[in-house]
Amino acid sequence: MSKGTDGAFEKNGRYYKVPDGVFSSGRLNEAPCPTNERRDEFESWVRTGDIAAAFFGHDHVNDFTENVEGIDLVQTIGAGYHTYGGERGGRLIILDENVPYKYETEIYRIDRISNGKV
């Protein structure tokens, strides 16, 4: 992908774009920050066959969900204040011990947290 492509993100000098319709919900506002080392962690989850979802933070302005090989990968928007970007929030995850492979989740943005509506 070339520099200047609409919607493309730069990572380590290369440009990437997620195809339209890939994410089930949420937004990708910056390139994710995966480790530079390959650890095969995700592949082990797929082999195990009993992982429903994995939740991640750190990427400051991303808040998406996507199912990859039967596992929901869920990125949560940043909650800290000593970083770039203006939007902050958190993710509520509701689990039912009787149905462990089903969950509900909702993003709470800082304006909703701080305006007395919650």
Would you name each region that the model predicts?
Residues 1-59:
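His/acidic metal-ligating clusters that form di-metal
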Residues 26-27, 32-48, 62-118:
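Binuclear metal-dependent phosphoesterase catalytic core
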